[in-house]
Amino acid sequence: MSVFTHLSLSPINIAAALFPTKAYNSAYAKGEQMINETMYACGAESSIIREIFSYGLERKAQIGAENVFDFSLGNPSVPAPAAVAESIKKALELPSDQLHGYTPAPGLPQCRTAVAESLNRRFGTSYEGKDVFMTVGAAASLTCTLNAVTNPGDEVIVIAPYFPEYRVWIEKAGCTCVEALADEDTFQLSVDNVLKAITDKTAAVIIDSPNNPTGAVYTRDTLTRLANVLCEVNAKRDPENPITLISDEPYREIVYGAEVPWVPSIYEHTIVCYSYSKSLSLPGERVGWILVPDTNPQAARLMSAVAGAARTLGFVCAPALFQRVIIDCIDEPSDVEAYARNRTALTDALAEYGYTYVEPDGAFYLWVKALEPDANAFCERAKKYELLAVPSDSFGMPGWFRLGYCVSYETIVNSLPAWKQLADEYRQK
């Protein structure tokens, strides 16, 4: 018999029949919607980076964009290479079903092969297209990888300071985010601190080199020592349960003379996550990849787990158009010179004004010591001069702030008097 047989078909009566709980019926009767409170909290509390960026947009509308110096976001001001536009024009000549149709979930075979062959040319490897899974950018690469290599209750180690969304993605995978403090002098990862953070529940370690937010590039020696420690831990574990090293590499191409070692050649249980948001200045197009190296003893099972994670998280396929762009532009160089020019102009001036910072070897961020212990208070004071910086607390380390110098050169130069005025104000306190 239908549950509706003896009920008038009002929404409240239907809800009461289908969901006979006091909490639901009370909320429904009041016109409230039952929602996932965890997701609500995550959405209601936006990241500090996005909050500052939104504030900057408001101020620009009020006083003019040229009067606001927004260093909050890693949004490249360097144009995408000309080859990108040419590739798009070429793709537009394709039949609509090819241009806009679904691709295979792991990506176009020719795109996956192009990525593998590019890596082989650069690092002397022998990867194949089957080792590459195309994604909707680095965020998707990381969330898929985390969900593929962890189980609820596991722990994932991050190197503090770290990109704040790591914690969000780790916790939403049902895991605990464990911070291992970087070396406070060099901001190289501290192998000793990682070792102290490892427990029987450790499933993975995330590294990010060149690093966001410090600009540090982890040396081969540092990575080799980390690999040795992880191998020692793995030797005491079930062989089917090694610690996975997740190498997050969206800034690999943006370096100032430093070597960025190829991590899979150092530690076999490595998965690489990559994005073209920074190297090709395509942050809004959302295209990247996951590499599960064929040298990883669990490669076949891991790739299936990555595919399963992408499926359950709702990532149908990477953007078809931009997979074709990647095929054409796979080895296009980044305009590192523009970022180097910005870096020099900013660091020379801040040093003169008395600021202390970490010399960045890569990426396009400057990690600067706040002029008072409370970085949040410092960044609020900086707003008086229309200087928008991200306080370090959300990166897992107090007392610093991050500047994204991927802005225009004019923004750098025009902001310098304000940085001097801010420093002068602190000297007079």
What role is predicted for each listed range?
Residues 6, 11-50, 60-93, 106, ...:
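PLP-dependent class I/II
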Residues 98-103:
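Short, surface-exposed loop/turn segments at secondary-structure junctions
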Residues 57:
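Charged, glycine-enriched surface loops/patches
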